[in-house]
Structures are given as C-alpha cells and as structure tokens.
Amino acid sequence: MRFRLLLSILFGFCSITVAQTSRSVHSTQLGVAHIGGLYSFTETNYLNEGAAKVQEIGARCIKVSLSLDTDNPSSKLYPFHSQWPAVETLDALADTPYYRELFARKFDTFILNAFRPGRAASYWRESFSVEDETAEEECFASLGLHLLRTYAKTNKTFIIQNWEGDWALRGCFDPTAKPSSAATAAMIRWLAARQRGISRARAEFGSGGARVFHACEVNLVRQAQVQNAPSVTTDVLPHVAVDLASYSAWDTKDSPKHFAEALAFIAKHKQETEPFGKHGVYVGEFGFPESEATPQLAFERTASLLAEAQRFGCPYAVYWQIYCNEPTSQPPKVNTDYKGFWLLRPDGTRSLICELFAQ
C-alpha cells in the first residue's frame, strides 16, 4: 500500500495448493510484508523484530525494503532500536548485520523493494541518461551477484522489484493524472536496465542453490481495463521482458471478481519468460483494512482474494502487512488510530487473518 479457498483454503503452512488446468498442481506461497510499520514491541532491531513476528505467524515468504534511495531508505523504514551503518551500495547494505540476520532466517522467499543509492526512487521520470542506464544495470548486477554468491547453498529465492509503478509513472497519487510519453519511455529503459543487471548476475554466477529474479510492480490495473487509461500494464510491461510482474491490488480489493480479472489482464500484457511461463504474475500487496470492515469481514475478503490468486496460479501472494503503516490520527496511540493494515495490532492482539497461515 502507500508509503503508502479452487474452493477451499488449506489452513496448513503458507504454501497453499490449488488445481490448475495448465498443470496438475500449482502452489501459491502466502507471504507478509514488513515495511514502514509505526510501532514495535521489543528492543530487537526493527527489521528483524518484524521478520521474527512474520515467522511466528507461519509465513515462509517476506517482503521488505532493501534500499538506499533518497525517499524511503531502509534506515527510515526500519528505525526502531536500530543503528544503521553508512553504506554506499545495495550489496553493501545487503551485507550489513541486520540484513545478514534477516537472510539467515528460515524464509524460502525474500521480495525486496530496491532502488539505486542516492537518487529518488522515480528520478528517471524527469531525466534518464545513458549514464543512469549503465549505473542501474551495474547496481543490480552487483546486488544480484552478491545474493547468488552469499546464499548459494541455501535454495533461497530473492525477487527484486520496484514499488507501485503506476504512481511512479505519474509522479503523484492522482489516478487521473496522465503520464508523459517521455516518462513512459524512460520507465521502459529503466526497468530494462535493472532486468539486464539481474540477468547478467545469473549468467555470471551460473547454476546454484539460490535464485534471483526481477519484477515490475503495477497498481492501477482496473482503470486501464475499463477506461483504457494509461498504465504500466499496457504501456510498459509489453516492452520489457521482466522475470515477473507484481500486482499491488488495492484498486480491486472490494471485488474478488475484478481482482481475478486484473490478474488476467496483467498476464495478457506481460511477456512470458522462464522459469515462470504462464505463472509470471504474483500479488505484491493485498488485504483489507479493519478500519473499513469488521475483523471477520476483513478475514473473509482477504481469504476470497487469496482464493482467486491461487486459482489463477500466482506463485506468491503477499499480505499487507505485519504492522500497520497508516495512521488515522496523530499521534497514533491505540488500535482505532490506525487504518488496520495489520496481522499484529498495536495492542499486541492478532488479526483473524493470521489463521490463513495456521498449521
């Protein structure tokens, strides 16, 4: 969100099996995001406090930020009980004690919001030079190679992605804003450079236990479908052979039917790439805030959306999130002062949605 059961759900672990027409079985790994939460419970560094809570709930996939951009660097998003060292590269950031501790945890998949150091996350919208293009490729080749080498014997998967590309393309949170043709062209080049870097890292490392992929995240999908509005899905994705496409699914959270249609729409526009093939679209963010519904309704809607992601064959579906990051009152003090994007509330109680991860 902003920075900002295929008929039954098997309540057993975070990998949920569904039948597929294209192959006999496909598994959707249910994950949890931990990005920019507003409260904490322990004196553990915040990145790993949240990760430990995600593990306790039963998830084997976690989405975090690993970034040095000037908008939302990791030090800003994980501030509690943390002393972040000064580093200049993403591979150096990944090698800090906090991230080494995180990556040593028993998660199968790490989804990483990552941006090049020292620049705004969407700086390319205003200007994207040949030098920038080269720097992006080198940055992500270096990060990818570091992850592959460091975790070669672990069988862990790392997915490096942007965040909500349709907002980045517009430069604002107004869905009616029209992106410029120059911004669209720059985004294509920017994503292609990141993908080249990750592809280079894989080629240089060769085969091994760990896997690294690159994803493009989209978020304004429904309006592109029904209004033919400009979008990353229709105007960018067809032109870049990214490994995966991520859907931050807030525009269809009220309708499982529209959510399923959006997944199909994204897949229609994404180039099929190996090893995911027809299953190259995952849900990068989804859920239902408790401020808009009873806890029971929020659970039921989240379960319905998850069922559609399973039915479609998404490899991952990431619930937003472990701790809420959006206040409704300042300063937030009690549960009702937050929008309710959580698995753990500020008072320490658990959301019913945790049952989706229960053994």
Language-model segments: which ranges?
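Aromatic-lined carbohydrate-recognition surfaces of secreted/lumenal glycan-active proteins
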Residues: 157-163, 185-229, 276-287, 317-322
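Boundary at the C-terminal end of the N-terminal hydrophobic targeting segment
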Residues: 17-21
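Aromatic-rich peripheral "rim/lid" segments of glycoside hydrolase catalytic domains that contact
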Residues: 42, 74-92, 102, 106, ...
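Bacterial N-terminal signal peptides
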Residues: 6-15
